[in-house]
Amino acid sequence: LLVLAENKELFQENGIEPMVSELPFIQACRDKRNTGTFLNSHDIRVPAPVDKYHPTFPLFAKPYDGSLSKDLYVVRGKEELTSEILNHPKLIFMEYIDKQEYKEFTVDMYYGKDNRVKAIVPRERIEIRAGEINKGFTRKNYLVRFLKERLDYLPGVVGCICIQLFY
């Protein structure tokens, strides 16, 4: 998406209209610290941050710029908080959301050129491979209304965006 957004004018000069969000939105979403701020600003709760030097357990750590489920850590106690995890320069630390208590969803949202959401498709994550859903259930549920109320209009957002949520 970043390459498409950076070259949007080049595409348009050649008669191609890429359905891609504006560059500032894409750049912000590439850093999970910004994504949390964005979601909070739209009344969507995110896991609480955890101070890695004064942690509460269990906690979850992941790279702020990560993808493909790489370098993800569930730390259940002090003995599991290794120096490798503590000193990893890109990890952010947050409260752990127990998948036994909450279901995890990937939600695809499609935005038109008017920056309004046109479709919201929640998929329950059953089996994951390399960070992507391998098995899932598409379910219309409360998330459709919840997200429509909060993210119906997003200036600069066009095409598909994807959000992972617990519900």
Regions found by a protein language model. Name each.
Residues L1-R30, R45-A48:
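A short, GP-enriched loop/loop-strand-helix hinge that lies immediately N-terminal to
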